[in-house]
């Protein structure tokens, strides 16, 4: 398959390889979503992919699926709709998927992230070492979304601690 060849070649020549998946398309089933999640974990294990992200489908204006969902009256175009397009709240559990609930999609997204990052770090323990070695450096540069989120959390803790000590 050309996709796997591209991933394999990019990783072999030293490129940073990151995969992004969208789950929960209107026609998808639970099995379809699980296939995407396990494919991401497989690529992390087999080829050394550095980052695997999962997003839940949302219908974008002008797209074929948007028009289809609008025609079927499965989405309402109002201010709230556009507000939700620009900001994704992980606690929101809405789904356009006919076969999977919003709560299940949120769980699958979390499961996908968890499985992928566990695979990314356990399959190549040097990444754990490099992360901790570089984390407290002034010029820390995260190699994936997980590291960025940990770093953001750390910075917020430091700022809150500093703010509380001033008060």
Question: Which residues does each PLM region occupy?
Answer:
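Membrane-proximal basic amphipathic "stem/tether" segments
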Residues: 104-167
